[in-house]
Amino acid sequence: MCDDEVAALVVDNGSGMCKAGFAGDDAPRAVFPSIVGRPRHQGVMVGMGQKDSYVGDEAQSKRGILTLKYPIEHGIVTNWDDMEKIWHHTFYNELRVAPEEHPVLLTEAPLNPKANREKMTQIMFETFNTPAMYVAIQAVLSLYASGRTTGVVLDSGDGVTHTVPIYEGYALPHAILRLDLAGRDLTDYLMKILTERGYSFTTTAEREIVRDIKEKLCYVALDFEQEMATAASSSSLEKSYELPDGQVITVGNERFRCPEAMFQPSFLGMESAGIHETSYNSIMKCDIDIRKDLYANTVLSGGTTMYPGIADRMQKEITALAPSTMKIKIIAPPERKYSVWIGGSILASLSTFQQMWISKQEYDESGPSIVHRKCF
């Protein structure tokens, strides 16, 4: 029996993208949008083999005729039927494996409702008949991937942002802070401010175009006010973007106004603190003796930390909040888009982790609540 056959599967189900692959690999084999699309129109071509639903890239490519829905919102699964479709697609179409032959490691956002992970556990054992499974906290995996056991992780994806202080491998639950402001909100905000420029994006398909504009053109300004002044006085910051129909649009100060909302949530009408302040607040909730180690190991992870300029800006903002003599280091690994998955791959292939799996037998004896006892 070759190694690949019993390799654990690592599935990082993000609100925006699903990352899946085999434990021990250094990158996910499959990365596709966490989308389920359903046709908006009646099929008229007989024998076209039209399906009643499409998942992932196929939904993305046929988006013009589909209504796209994301079953995961703010890191929490809101539609379990669609979620099952995504998992089915992951195992059978993307990885091409039989889930009943592999242990499965899933990930989840901290401070998620308990029912969410119970249901995940139930579906894995009852629908997919996995021999074993485990649910790991996303931010903890990112820290593993960076080769550290102590640090504060700022993990920001498409649906949720959280800051998790970890000391010697233990997450400190009292100091975890969660911010329901992430990539999807920035996409919506960019849709809104592009409308002010006279470009209208409204449908679920057009939102995907705006997400692409955001990923290709946005950046974080080191000094927002100064950048606004520069944008007003010259056209040096303007960039053009070609829409799928060939129309070219020009994007100016929207490029940095959009991600600025991460530092100033008031842009979105939210009263919460920005990511810099949230990170600082998380550190301040920790014991005074370990803060120094946390300041020196602030690790960024997730797709919403991919904006150029974000690490420098975080450094500047946290330096302003922290004691003046404090050494502050922001770590932004180049592979941080996938660091949760990479951490999962590392964890699931450790020999010491093998006794941590929840087995089918344990599940049959205890039911879904076993997940709270065996997974942090």
UniProtKB/Swiss-Prot annotation:
Q: Does the keyword Iron apply?
A: no
What domain of life?
Eukaryota
Q: What keywords tag this UniProt record? A: Acetylation, ATP-binding, Cytoplasm, Cytoskeleton, Hydrolase, Nucleotide-binding
**What PROSITE patterns has UniProt attached to this entry?**
ACTINS_1 (PS00406), ACTINS_2 (PS00432), ACTINS_ACT_LIKE (PS01132)
Positions annotated as pro-peptide in this chain are: 1-2
EC number(s) per entry: 3.6.4.-
Positions of post-translational N-acetylaspartate modification: 3
Question: Could you tell me which InterPro entries the record lists for this protein?
Answer: Actin, Actin/actin-like_CS, Actin_CS, ATPase_NBD
The record's catalysed reaction(s) read: ATP + H2O = ADP + phosphate + H(+)
Q: Where in the cell is it found?
A: Cytoplasm, Cytoskeleton
Additional record remark: In this organism there are four genes coding for actin. The sequences coded by genes 1 and 3 are identical. There are a few variations in the actins coded by genes 2 and 4.
- What is the similarity comment for this entry? Belongs to the actin family.
Q: What does this protein do?
A: Actins are highly conserved proteins that are involved in various types of cell motility and are ubiquitously expressed in all eukaryotic cells.
What is this protein's name? Actin-1
